[in-house]
C-alpha cells in the first residue's frame, strides 16, 4: 500500500499541471478584467476582419406577370422594407458572440470535480461545498413557464390606412420577485388556484349573455319535453326528474316559468293515482316490508311531497296578484289559475284536495272578477254535477260556506249560485243486476245454454248467490254514504240561505232562488222557521227594492217568496204539525204584484231564449233558475186556487178581474197563458161566470181595482169585458185563446 502511494502515474501529473495553468489563468483574468480585454475577444475581432463574406446565390430573373403588377399597385407599402435592406449584409456569415464568464467558471469547476475523483491522494484546493451553497442570481429567479399564464393579452385587430388588418399585442410587465424556492412554489400554486377560480367565474358569467334569449327558451323547452316524456314512460324510476322541472321554474324568464308549470301540470295529471294515498302508521313503519312494498311506499310518499310543493308554488303565485301587475306577470297568474282549474277537474279525489279547493275559492271570493274567474266557476260546477256520492261536494260546500261567512255574505252572485249546481236532487237508483241477469237468461233458448253437469250447476248457483250478496252489500254501503253526505250538504246550504235572508242583503234574490228549488228536500222541523223568515220579508216592502233595482225587477224576488211559501204549505206531512200556516200576507203580496208584473216585457223569457238586449233596460243579475216569472205566477195560482179549500168568493173574483186586466198588457205568450188560467178558473168555479154578464148585481159598492187588499176591492160588481176585446188581438194565439174562453162559458 505504501509503495502504491509513493508510486506516481503520469495522469495525475498532467491533471495537476493543467489545474495549475487554469488557476493561474483565472487569477490573471480576475486581476486584469477591468484594464485589459481578454485574449479570446481580441482573437475573435482579428478573425472577423480576415474572414470573407458568403457568396450570394445567383437567381435567374423572372418577368412580372399581370397579377404581380396589380398586387404591387394595390399594396405599394408592402415593398418599402426592400429599400432598407443592404445586399452586403445578406452575405455576411453569422457568428456567435463571446461566451459569458460564468460559462468558463462552471466548466473549470466541472473539470476540477472530475480530476478530484481521479486522484484521491491530492487534497482539494477549492471548497466545492461552499461554492455549491452560494446560488447565482439566475438560480434565485422563479421558474415560471409561459404555459402557466392562462390569460390572453391580445387586443382587437386594427385596420391600417392601407386597408390591412394588424394584430396588436398589449405590453405586459411581469414583475420579477426574488423569492426562495419553497415560497415561489407555494405562491405559484395559490396564484394558479386563484386564476382558475377567476376563470371559472368569468366563464360562468359569459355563458348567459352568449346564449340568446330565444335559444335559451328553446333549449329549456326541449329539456322540459324530454324530461316529461321520460316521467310519463317510467314514473317510478324517473320520479327524480320532477326536481329538474322545479329548477326550471327559478329561471329569470317568465316564459320558462310558465312552461315549467304547464309541464308539471301535465305530469301530475297523468301519474296521479285514482286513489288517495294513505300514510303508514308508526307500527307499519317499524315493521319490515318487502322490497316491492317498500319501493311502492317510497314512490307514493315522494310523489305526495312533489305534489304538495307544486300546490305551494301555485299558492305563492296566486297570492301575488295585484292590479299593478304587468302583462308578463299577469300571464303567469293566468297559467297558475289554469293549473288550479285542471287539477280540480281531475285530481279532486287525491290528497290535499281541501287545499286545492281553498285556492280556487280564494280567487273567486273578491268583489270584482279576476282573470280566470269563469274557468274556476265552471270547474266547480262540473265537480258538483259529476259527484254522485257527494263526498267531494261536501268538502267544497264547506269551504264555500266558510268563505261566505267571513265575507259577511257579500260576494258575487255567480259564486253564491254555485249551491244550485250541487247534485242532490237526483235519487239514487240501485239497479237489480241479478234480476236483469235472470231475465236475460230466461229469454235465452235452452239450446243456446251450455251443458252443465249436476255438480257444475250447483257450483254456478252458489257463485251466483255470493256475487249477488256482495253487490247488495256494496249498494247498501253506497246508499248509506250518499244519504249521509247529502244530508250534511243540505244542512250547510240551508243554513247559508237562512243567514242571507235574515241579513236582507243584496243576495236575497239568489237565496230565494235556492230555497225555492230545494224547499221540497227541507226537513219538516225547519219549515216553521223558514215560513217565519219569509213572512218577515213579505211584510217589508222595501226589502226587494235596493238602490240598483227597479220595481219591475223586484217582482221576481216577490214571486219567489210567495211561491216558496205556498210550496212549503202544500208539502206532505205539514198538516200534521202544529204550524202557523196563515198565508194571508202572501196572498196580499201576490195580489199586489200582478200589475207590476204585467208591465214586464220579459215576463215570458228566460236566459236560454236568444233575443236582442234592450239598451235602455236596467242591468239584471245572472239567474241560475231558468224558470220564467210567468211560470212562477202560474205556479202560485195553481197552489192557491186548486190545492187549497174554502176560498172566499171575493178573493176569487178579485184575482180573476186583476188577471183579466193584466192580460191586456202582457206579451203574447204570457197573455195566452193568462187567458188559459182564467178559463180553468171559470170552469172550476161556476159562480165566476156572472162576471161575464152585464146584468146589475147587488154589491157593497163600486169596484176599485187599485186597492191592494183583494177582500176590500168590491170585485163582486166587476165585469170581465177584457176577453171580448182580446178577440180582436193582433196575435192569432191570443185571439184564439179569448174565443175559447168565451166559448167555454157559452157566451
Swiss-Prot record:
It comes from Schizosaccharomyces pombe (strain 972 / ATCC 24843) (Fission yeast). The modification Phosphoserine is found at residue 120. Residues 214-234 form a coiled coil. This is Nucleolar complex-associated protein 3. It comes from the Eukaryota. The gene is noc3. Residues 1-11 have a biased composition (Basic residues). Signal peptide: none annotated. Residues 74-86 have a biased composition (Polar residues). InterPro entries: CCAAT-binding_factor (IPR005612), Noc3_N (IPR011501), Nucleolar_cplx-assoc_3 (IPR016903). May be required for synthesis of 60S ribosomal subunits and the transport of pre-ribosomes from the nucleoplasm to the cytoplasm. One of its GO terms (cellular component) is nucleolus. GO terms for molecular function: chromatin binding. Belongs to the CBF/MAK21 family. Residues 89-109 have a biased composition (Basic and acidic residues). The keyword Coiled coil applies. Residues 1-142 are annotated as: Disordered. The keyword Lipoprotein does not apply. PANTHER family: NUCLEOLAR COMPLEX PROTEIN 3, NUCLEOLAR COMPLEX PROTEIN 3 HOMOLOG.
Amino acid at each position: 500500500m505504501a509503495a502504491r502511494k509513493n508510486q506516481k502515474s503520469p495522469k495525475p501529473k498532467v491533471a495537476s499541471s493543467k489545474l495549475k495553468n487554469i488557476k493561474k489563468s483565472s487569477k490573471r483574468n480576475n486581476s486584469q478584467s477591468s484594464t485589459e480585454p481578454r485574449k479570446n475577444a481580441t482573437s475573435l475581432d482579428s478573425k472577423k476582419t480576415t474572414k470573407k463574406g458568403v457568396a450570394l446565390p445567383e437567381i435567374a430573373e423572372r418577368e412580372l406577370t399581370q397579377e404581380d403588377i396589380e398586387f404591387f399597385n394595390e399594396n405599394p407599402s408592402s415593398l418599402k422594407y426592400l429599400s432598407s435592406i443592404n445586399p452586403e449584409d445578406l452575405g455576411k456569415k453569422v457568428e456567435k458572440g463571446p461566451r459569458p464568464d460564468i460559462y468558463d467558471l462552471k466548466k473549470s469547476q466541472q473539470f476540477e470535480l472530475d480530476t478530484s475523483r481521479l486522484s484521491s491522494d491530492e487534497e482539494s484546493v477549492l471548497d466545492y461545498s461552499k461554492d455549491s451553497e452560494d446560488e447565482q442570481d439566475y438560480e434565485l429567479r422563479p421558474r415560471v413557464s409561459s404555459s402557466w399564464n392562462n390569460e390572453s393579452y391580445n387586443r382587437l385587430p386594427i385596420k391600417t390606412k392601407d386597408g390591412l388588418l394588424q394584430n396588436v399585442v398589449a405590453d405586459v410587465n411581469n414583475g420579477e420577485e426574488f423569492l426562495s424556492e419553497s415560497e415561489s412554489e407555494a405562491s405559484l400554486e395559490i396564484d394558479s388556484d386563484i386564476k382558475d377560480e377567476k376563470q371559472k367565474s368569468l366563464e360562468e358569467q359569459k355563458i348567459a349573455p352568449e346564449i340568446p334569449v330565444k335559444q335559451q327558451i328553446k333549449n329549456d323547452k326541449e329539456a322540459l319535453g324530454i324530461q316529461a316524456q321520460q316521467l310519463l314512460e317510467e314514473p317510478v324510476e324517473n320520479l327524480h326528474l320532477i326536481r329538474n322541472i322545479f329548477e326550471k321554474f327559478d329561471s329569470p324568464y317568465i316564459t320558462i316559468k310558465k312552461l315549467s308549470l304547464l309541464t308539471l301540470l301535465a305530469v301530475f295529471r297523468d301519474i296521479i293515482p285514482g286513489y288517495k294515498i294513505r300514510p303508514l302508521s308508526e307500527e307499519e313503519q317499524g315493521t319490515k316490508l318487502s322490497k316491492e312494498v317498500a319501493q311502492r311506499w317510497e314512490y307514493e310518499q315522494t310523489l305526495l311531497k312533489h305534489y304538495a310543493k307544486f300546490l305551494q308554488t301555485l299558492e305563492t303565485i296566486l297570492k301575488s296578484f295585484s292590479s299593478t301587475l304587468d302583462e308578463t306577470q299577469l300571464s303567469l297568474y293566468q297559467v297558475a289559475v289554469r293549473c288550479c282549474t285542471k287539477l280540480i277537474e281531475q285530481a279532486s279525489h287525491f290528497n290535499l284536495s281541501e287545499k286545492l279547493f281553498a285556492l280556487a275559492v280564494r280567487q273567486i271570493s273578491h268583489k270584482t272578477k279576476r282573470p280566470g274567474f269563469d274557468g274556476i266557476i265552471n270547474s266547480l260546477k262540473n265537480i258538483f254535477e259529476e259527484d254522485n256520492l257527494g263526498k267531494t261536494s261536501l268538502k267544497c260546500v264547506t269551504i264555500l260556506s266558510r268563505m261566505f261567512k267571513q265575507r259577511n255574505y257579500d260576494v258575487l252572485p255567480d259564486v253564491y249560485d254555485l249551491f244550485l249546481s250541487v247534485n242532490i236532487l237526483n235519487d239514487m237508483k240501485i239497479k237489480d243486476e241479478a234480476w236483469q241477469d235472470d231475465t236475460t237468461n230466461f229469454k235465452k233458448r235452452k239450446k243456446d245454454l251450455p251443458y252443465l253437469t249436476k255438480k257444475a250447476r250447483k257450483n254456478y248457483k252458489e257463485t251466483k248467490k255470493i256475487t249477488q250478496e256482495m253487490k247488495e252489500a256494496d249498494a247498501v254501503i253506497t246508499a248509506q254514504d250518499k244519504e249521509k253526505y247529502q244530508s250534511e250538504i243540505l244542512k250547510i246550504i240551508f243554513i247559508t240561505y237562512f243567514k242571507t235572508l235574515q241579513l236582507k242583503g243584496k243576495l236575497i234574490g239568489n237565496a230565494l232562488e235556492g230555497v225555492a228549488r230545494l224547499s221540497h228536500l227541507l226537513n219538516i222541523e225547519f219549515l216553521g222557521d223558514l215560513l217565519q223568515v219569509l213572512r218577515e220579508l213579505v211584510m217589508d216592502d222595501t226589502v226587494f227594492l235596493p238602490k240598483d233595482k227597479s220595481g219591475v225587477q223586484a217582482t221576481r224576488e216577490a214571486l219567489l217568496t210567495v211561491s216558496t211559501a205556498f210550496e212549503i204549505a202544500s208539502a206532505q206531512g205539514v198538516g200534521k204539525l202544529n204550524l202557523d200556516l196563515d198565508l194571508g200576507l202572501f196572498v196580499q203580496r201576490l195580489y199586489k204584484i200582478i200589475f207590476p208584473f204585467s208591465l214586464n216585457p220579459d215576463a215570458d223569457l228566460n236566459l236560454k231564449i236568444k233575443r236582442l238586449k234592450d239598451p235602455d233596460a236596467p242591468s239584471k243579475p245572472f239567474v241560475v233558475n231558468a224558470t220564467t216569472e210567468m211560470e212562477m205566477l202560474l205556479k202560485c195560482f195553481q197552489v192557491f186556487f186548486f190545492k187549497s179549500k174554502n176560498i172566499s168568493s171575493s178573493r176569487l173574483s178579485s184575482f180573476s178581474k186583476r188577471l183579466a186586466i193584466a192580460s191586456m198588457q202582457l206579451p203574447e205568450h204570457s197573455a195566452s197563458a193568462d187567458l188559459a188560467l182564467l178559463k180553468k178558473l171559470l170552469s172550476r168555479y161556476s159562480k165566476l161566470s156572472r162576471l161575464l154578464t152585464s146584468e146589475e148585481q147587488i154589491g157593497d159598492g163600486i169596484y176599485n181595482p187599485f186597492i191592494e187588499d183583494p177582500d176590500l176591492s168590491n170585485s163582486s160588481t166587476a165585469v170581465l169585458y177584457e176577453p171580448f176585446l182580446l178577440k180582436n188581438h193582433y196575435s192569432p194565439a191570443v185571439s184564439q185563446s179569448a174565443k175559447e174562453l168565451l166559448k167555454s162559458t157559452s157566451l
